[in-house]
Amino acid sequence: MLEEGRFLLERIRKKSLLLILLIFFLVSFESNDKNIDKISNFLNNFKTISANFIQLDNNGNPTTGNIKIKRPGKMRIEYNKPVSNLIISDGIKVALINKKSSSINLYSLNQIPIKVLLSNDFSLENYQVINYKEVNNIIEIEITSKKDKELGSITFIFEHRPMQIKKWIINEINGSKTEIFLSDVFINKKLDNNFFRIIDPRKIPFGRKE
C-alpha cells in the first residue's frame, strides 16, 4: 500500500513537472512571437535611419563612418579617412565609388543583402528565421530570403526596451561576415534626397568636391 502511494505521488510529481515545463515553453514561445512581431513592425514601419558605425570585416579589422537610409531603396554609406570608399543606392542601382582613384562600380539593388532594410514593404513572410535568441534586454534574430538564399543571411541585434536597432551582421554563403555596430542612431529624421544622388567621379571637374 505504501509503495502504491509512493508510486502515485511520483506520477503526480512528474506530471506537475511536465505541466510546469509546458507552461514555461508556451510562455516563452508567446514572448518570442510578440518580440518577433515588434521587430517585424520596426523593420516595416521606419522611414529613415541615420547613424554612425564601426564596421568589422571578417578578420576583425575596423573601419568607421556614417550610414543614411531612406526608404524606399535609398542608402548612403560614407567611410571616414583613410578609407576613401563611398556606397550610394539611389533606389534603382548601387554605386561603389572610390573617391581617391575616382573609380565607380555599379550593381543591382537586388545584389546586396542589406536590401531588407531598404524595402518599403518588408514582410517576414518573405524570409526564413534561421536563429532567434533573447538574453536580458538584447534580441538577436537571423533571417535569410526564401527566394535569394545565395545572398546569405543577415543578423539583426536589437535592444528590447525600448525597441532600438544596435547592430547587424551580414553573413555571406562563403562563410565570411561583416559586422556593423551602430551609434548615435536617429530614426525617421528628415534626409535630403541629394544625399542619395549617384555622381560619376570621373565626370566631376578637377578640383571640385561633391
Sequence positions of predicted segments:
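N-terminal secretory signal peptides that target proteins for export/translocation
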Residues: 1-13
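Cleaved targeting-peptide boundary
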Residues: 30-37
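Sec-dependent signal peptide recognition
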Residues: 13-22
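Short hydrophobic/aromatic-rich beta-strand segments that constitute the beta-sheet cores
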Residues: 51-53, 75-79, 94-97, 141, ...
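Hydrophobic h-region of N-terminal signal peptides that target proteins for export
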Residues: 21-30
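A short, Trp-centered hydrophobic/proline-enriched beta-strand micro-motif
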Residues: 41-60, 68
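Gly/Pro-enriched, hydrophobic low-complexity segments
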Residues: 125-208
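An acidic-aromatic
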Residues: 66-116, 178
